[in-house]
Amino acid sequence: MAKSQNKESYNKIFAKLKEHHKWFENSIPLIASENIPSPAVREAVISDFGNRYAEGWPGERVYAGCIYIDDVEFECMKLAKKLYKAKFADVRPISGVVANLAVYSAYSNPGDVMLAPSIPAGGHISHGKKEHSGTAGLVHGLEIEFYPFDAEEMTIDVDKTKQKVKELKKNNRLPKIAMFGGSLFLFPHPVKELSDFLKSYDMHINYDAAHVAGLIAGGKFQDPLKEGADTMTMSTHKTLFGPQGGLVLGSEKHEEPIKKATFPGLTSSHHINNMAGKAVAFAEALEFGKDYAAQVIKNAKSFAEALSDAGFKVLGESRGFTQSHQIAVNVLDYSDGGKVEADLEKANIIVNRQLIPGDIKAGRNYFHPGGIRLGVSEITRLGMKKNEMQEIASFIKQVVIEKKDPKKLLSKVKSFRKNYQKVKFCFDNKLGAYEYVKLR
């Protein structure tokens, strides 16, 4: 009896995996923190590398059996440094959060202060306070001070930040780390405008490029390391179209502190198969990244304009809505972000609810925030352009503004998706973007 139940669970797992792939073949994926890897990246990720251990730095491993792993990891580091014009790269962090922790560990101690964007102003939970279960506070014990934020311009307020830093110094709360970047990231952050000032107070400047890494690689966003950031952290699977993982970049002087923080501090083995997938993605980004990043930004602007024309309140209007892959929409005229997210999912349109400026003061929380966040990274990699952005905006209008039954749109959404089943901006794309690979 137990054996048959075990086999039933076994079969159920594979059935659900296949159902998921089929669902995404017929959906419009607009999660800003996601992308679709190429078949080549998927091949690297399912390799035997995933079964091996390679603790430490390549050439200095704790384990034997790493001859080819070392070769690939050296190549991965070389490609990462070339892609971002950096002198040092640590490709071992297994996520963007772990990459951030490496910087916290290398350049601060528990009880120190970090300056970062608040979550309603676009900050990521890994930059957050302990009382909010933020990684910086909960795991590393940092005290967090927030940048003053200009809600109209949707970016950090430079003058008020300078004033705040001076006040923090008077109160003996001068930050050790200044963190730029975030999860709601419409426009470049003022790294160039603030870096000299922050460094005059001996702050280590880190730029969390998780969301915009592919745009930076393509030369279509800001260049944080050139503008004054000491280090740059990122995840590798958003606008940079690799597997899930992390990366830390910097100059030679950052090598030893970051290496020690990453291992043995924060990783043992580091998901070596994903490291190989990162290397493939870096090569793809060097070859195709400029064209991809340019199309992403064109699509985001077209999408934002189409949504605005449809009657939505799109944030950042005074600056042209967006300069990244993201669009933020205030949906309070129709419902809240949680309800809109759920309604759109019924139509196979996948978005996420989003806290926006003003939500916390108004008593709204993450489950029922005032906005939704949309991203065009994945649909751009599927080959969509301006006309498709307008059509998707129409679908969203029908569900959210016109209150049409989402399930009645399913056939239209599925028909719309039929022509977009291959990954673009890559060397090889014989396999369908969401094609299920059976190995049994």
Swiss-Prot record:
Record flagged with keyword Amino-acid biosynthesis: yes
Keywords: Amino-acid biosynthesis, Cytoplasm, One-carbon metabolism, Pyridoxal phosphate, Transferase
UniProt site positions, description: Plays an important role in substrate specificity: H237
GO molecular function per UniProt: glycine hydroxymethyltransferase activity; pyridoxal phosphate binding
Alphabetical GO biological process terms: glycine biosynthetic process from serine; tetrahydrofolate interconversion; tetrahydrofolate metabolic process
GO CC terms in record: cytoplasm
Subunit structure, interactors included: Homodimer.
Biological role: Catalyzes the reversible interconversion of serine and glycine with a modified folate serving as the one-carbon carrier. Also exhibits a pteridine-independent aldolase activity toward beta-hydroxyamino acids, producing glycine and aldehydes, via a retro-aldol mechanism.
Protein name per UniProt: Serine hydroxymethyltransferase
Origin species: Nitrosopumilus maritimus (strain SCM1)
